[in-house]
């Protein structure tokens, strides 16, 4: 079966799991958990470029075929015509998509206010206080106190998942790849799901599928306990609605002042460089 590949990236705690649960209602679409496809492609490419064995007798056409086959082999067990691969680094790797997968990438990017993302992480850590989250483990290893301010600073540090995702997402703008990216605002998705999904299908150039936003099911669960120390990191409620608190109810003035108004994608008209 010939398969079309689309991509999900964007920011954490911005509804990507919810969004994939909606897309999975379409019988033609497969949206699995986070994928290692890009990493496998990257490290295979690095091997061919640096390995003594590969350099001693280079076969560039065969190297290209091997890397190009990664995504087909990874999804060989999926019998659906449209595959949605999730990796937060796709916007920073449009060139690899074009070189090895398709010349016309379509990357779906759920996004959200940065302070809402931080507030969501803090609430989740508090809900799972009987576990040691990946955030608290990093702080303990570095000798920092387990305060909410420190948690937010870690998430926004170069080692933190929020900053890393912002960087990869921002590189899509820096490389003039906006035309390959469709942004899905979290608050639009939960407040106006049908209108938001119609825009998604229009971007994908697929016929619209009528979704049931009151009967959602998360099919592909990640090992959140083992990997993140947060048992409900990728939970999806059956009925679509917004239940999170406002950031002002969760975060300190220090965090609110430091990380407000970072949503560059709402005002970017040209390549940007936030990460100098």
Residue ranges and their predicted role:
Residues 1-6, 154-158, 166, 173-175, ...:
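PAPS-dependent sulfotransferases, especially Golgi type II membrane carbohydrate sulfotransferases
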Residues 7, 18, 106, 185, ...:
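Amphipathic alpha-helical recognition patches that constitute DNA-binding helices
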Residues 33, 86, 253:
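Pocket-edge structural micro-motifs
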Residues 34-38, 110-115, 212-217:
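A short, structured active-site edge motif that brings together acidic residues
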Residues 36-43, 189, 265-276:
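C-terminal/domain-terminus segments
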Residues 81, 85-211, 226-235:
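PAPS-dependent sulfotransferase catalytic domain
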């Amino acid at each position: 079966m010939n398969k079309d590949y689309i991509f999900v990236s964007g920011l954490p705690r911005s509804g990507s799991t919810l969004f994939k649960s909606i897309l999975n209602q379409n019988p033609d679409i497969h949206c699995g958990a986070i994928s290692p496809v890009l990493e496998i492609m990257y490290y295979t490419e690095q091997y061919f470029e640096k390995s003594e064995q590969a350099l001693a007798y280079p076969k560039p056409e065969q190297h290209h075929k091997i890397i190009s086959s990664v995504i087909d082999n990874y999804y060989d067990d999926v019998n659906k015509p449209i595959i949605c691969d999730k990796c937060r680094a796709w916007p920073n790797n449009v060139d690899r998509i074009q070189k090895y997968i398709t010349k016309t990438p379509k990357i779906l990017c759920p996004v959200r206010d940065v302070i809402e993302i931080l507030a969501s992480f803090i609430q989740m850590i508090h809900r799972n206080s009987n576990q040691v989250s990946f955030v608290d483990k990093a702080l303990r290893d570095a000798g920092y106190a387990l305060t909410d301010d420190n948690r937010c600073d870690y998430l926004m540090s170069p080692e933190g998942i929020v900053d890393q995702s912002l960087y990869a997402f921002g590189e899509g703008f820096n490389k003039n790849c906006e035309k390959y990216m469709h942004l899905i605002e979290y608050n639009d998705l939960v407040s106006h799901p049908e209108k938001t999904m119609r825009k998604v299908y229009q971007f994908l150039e697929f016929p619209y599928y009528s979704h049931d936003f009151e009967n959602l099911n998360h099919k592909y669960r990640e090992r959140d306990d083992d990997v993140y120390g947060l048992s409900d990191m990728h939970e999806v409620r059956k009925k679509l609605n917004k239940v999170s608190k406002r950031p002002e109810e969760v975060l300190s003035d220090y965090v609110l002042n430091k990380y407000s108004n970072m949503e560059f994608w709402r005002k970017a008209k040209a390549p940007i460089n936030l990460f100098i």
